[in-house]
Amino acid sequence: MKITSFFAALLLLDLFSCCHAYPQDTLPDIEDAKFIEDCVRAHNKFRSKVNPPASNMYRMSWDAALAKTAKAWAKKCIFKHNVYLKVPRKVHPTFTPVGENIWTGTATIFSVDAALSDWFNEVSSYDFNTRSCSHVCGHYTQVVWAESYKVGCAVQFCNTIENMPGFFKAAHFVCNYGPAGNYPTKPYKAGQPCSGCSNEKCIDKLCDWDTRPQPPLYVPPAEHPHPFCDQYCLTISILRPLFLVLSVGATFVVQQQFPHIFFYE
C-alpha cells in the first residue's frame, strides 16, 4: 500500500520554498566591470547632451564608497531615500550631503541605460530658464548637476518593495552622487561646452577632472556584515519548519495506524 500524495505535496512545497527563497540573481554587483562602465558611460552621455549646452559640466567617474552606500541601501528594498544622506561621514568620508536617485522596475526589463533614460527624460517637465518643474524633475537635475563629479550605483533583486504594494520580483536601482546636487539654483551654467573649465581637459563636452584627489576607500556603516532577510524570506523561514513538523507528525500517525506501510521511490 502506498500513501504518497500528501507527503509528496509537503515535500514539493518545502523544496519550492527552499529553492525560491533566494531566486538566482542575474543582476550585476558593484564590482562588475561592465556595470561600472555602463553607469559612468550613461551618466556622461546624458550630461553631454544637455540643452542649452553646459559650460561647466564635469565628467563623472566611479566612486567605490558611493557604490557601497548605494548597495547597502538598495538591499533594504525600500522605495524611499536613504535617511543618512545628510549625516556627516555616515555614508561617505568626504561628501556631505550625498545625492541619490532611485529607479525600481521589473527585474527582467532592467538595464542601466533604461533607468538613466527615464531619469533624463524628466527634462520634458523642466524649464531651464525659470527653474520651474511641471511634474517630476529631481532625478534629471541630479543626473546633470554640473558639480557632481562622482557616482556610485547598485542594483538589488527584491521579491517585494516596501512602500510599493503589489510590486514583485523587482530590480531596485540606486545611484549616489558626490557632491550632491538639487540645490535651489540651476543645475549648470549655460554656455560654450567646457568654456567654464579651469585647467581640465575637455572630453565629449565635459570638463575632465581626473587630477582631482580621489576620495579614500571607505565602507559605510550600513554595509558592515549583518544578517539580511526581506519579508518573503521571513515568510519562508516561518513556513518551512511548520511543514517539517507537519510531515513528521503525519508520518508518525500513519505508522501508528498502518505499521506495515512503507514508502519507496
Q: Predicted segment positions?
A:
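Mature extracellular or exoplasmic CAP/SCP-family domains and secreted bioactive peptides
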Residues: 2-265
